[in-house]
């Protein structure tokens, strides 16, 4: 019985573990440089989305992942608004090989954070009295694969700061 308990405990210690600890807004900004005049114009928006992720090792097996979404919306040639959110999360991640850890931090965690960031941006934009901002889902696995390929071609290796 004791051998079975020791084996189970040993397997539990080496089994991959993933746990979301906390999701929070790290930074938030909104600018509407042409208000109130922009509200009196015909609305024909052009949306430009920039996104970025970064990871940081914390103490032990904890990691912070930050997803930054920056949106610039132009109405004709004028900037209607600029909104940015840094949506962050703290994750407990244990017992993953280097490739799995890189994928988890570079694609899986940002995928978890995106709906929160999208909702925060939408709320911010509507509070600025603009129409709702409905951002399409993002394929973080594809973005991660592209970044991996770019890094391999340039001889870089993925790192966690």
From Swiss-Prot:
InterPro entries: SecB, SecB-like_sf. Keywords: Chaperone, Cytoplasm, Protein transport, Translocation, Transport. GO terms for biological process: protein folding; protein tetramerization; protein transport. One of its GO terms (cellular component) is cytoplasm. GO terms for molecular function: unfolded protein binding. It is found in: Cytoplasm. It holds the Pfam family SecB. One of the proteins required for the normal export of preproteins out of the cell cytoplasm. It is a molecular chaperone that binds to a subset of precursor proteins, maintaining them in a translocation-competent state. It also specifically binds to its receptor SecA. HAMAP family: SecB. Belongs to the SecB family. Homotetramer, a dimer of dimers. One homotetramer interacts with 1 SecA dimer. This is Protein-export protein SecB. It comes from Pseudomonas fluorescens (strain Pf0-1).
